[in-house]
Amino acid sequence: MVEKRVQPLARDAMAYVLAGGRGSRLKELTDRRAKPAVYFGGKARIIDFALSNALNSGIRRIGVATQYKAHSLIRHMQRGWNFFRPERNESFDILPASQRVSETQWYEGTADAVYQNIDIIQDYGVEYMVILAGDHVYKMDYEWMLQQHVDSGADVTIGCLEVPRMEAVGFGVMHVNDKDEIIAFVEKPADPPPIPDKPDFALASMGIYVFHTKFLLDALRRDAADPNSSRDFGKDIIPYIVKNGKAVAHRFAKSCVRSDFEHEPYWRDVGTIDAYWQANIDLTAIVPELDIYDKSWPIWTYAEITPPAKFVHDDEDRRGSATSSVVSGDCIISGAMLNNSLLFTGVRANSFSKMEGAVILPNVKIGRRAQLKNVVIDHGVVIPEGLVVGEDAELDAKRFRRTESGICLITQPMIDKLDI
């Protein structure tokens, strides 16, 4: 007798990705695009991680709420995420703010971005909702979180991880009992409460929530009727449930997808220039903590058909070379030297130029004899011949967006203002 296979919970779930934020701490990098649309890892966009996690977890209904400067993001998803088939009970919906509930307002907060599309959610009739932030870099199997949600009988299950206490000021922070039931929750506290047995760490929300659909829709309607609400999950919905219902914490270590279990679970907010630079540079390690080469859990994305990368010239002072670097397709390293750098598609690096600790977005052109250290260079920038960045901190700060740790963000308008 063949045992009947139980359908994974993910097949009766919808992933709802919140992708409307600007990400203002990324400064000029989000002047033309929303944070989820920012390039990452040589080939992908940040949003591809949440979407790939959902797909790889078995979720086949996905909605993405967009708002701020969404053209680049929408175009990317239309090109790279158009393979869902309704005849297989699959769907992929892009949901710009469109005043579906109110004719006068855009999305007012994260909860409102779900509430305004409540009719679409009801039409699909799924049992569970997985609410995701579209601007984090990590690999996670949501099926484990769904299973914990069902087993615990929770009203909401919240993904969480341990972070250094002083870094927790930008997150929702929770206090749990020995059953991982949340007994207190505060959004972005100035003085984050520590984990009882780990005074230097706090338990931070990942912005991942699992609900039974009916419970979520009732909670959203109640919140929408409250004139004092800010329409936000972290500020309104979650604290209400913690106080009046049952909220359970799901620890990221239980569902993190990693190739090497000696590595710590990898999750990055990449919300600042420093964090964005570091997360990209992390990928140049011999064995990176975030494995983008894992074929069992691929990061799906839109990929142009491009020729291979090419390295040319082999003279003593003019040798195309790269060490400890990631170089994407259609790059030509023509007598240039790379070290500990990550190049996206279509970069041209010309003779005698040197790059170290460089994160270079697509279609950048590096002029001859340029010297670039610890930089993030935006899409399509043309670096003039002989430009030096990373040696004179004072000059760099006048010309570019330089962080306190010395990372320089370079955009084309900044280059256009140079007197060289």
Swiss-Prot record:
Pathway: Glycan biosynthesis; glycogen biosynthesis. Signal peptide: none annotated. PROSITE patterns: ADP_GLC_PYROPHOSPH_1, ADP_GLC_PYROPHOSPH_2, ADP_GLC_PYROPHOSPH_3. GO terms for molecular function: ATP binding; glucose-1-phosphate adenylyltransferase activity. SUPFAM superfamilies: Nucleotide-diphospho-sugar transferases (SSF53448), Trimeric LpxA-like enzymes (SSF51161). Belongs to the bacterial/plant glucose-1-phosphate adenylyltransferase family. This is Glucose-1-phosphate adenylyltransferase. It comes from Rhizobium johnstonii (strain DSM 114642 / LMG 32736 / 3841).
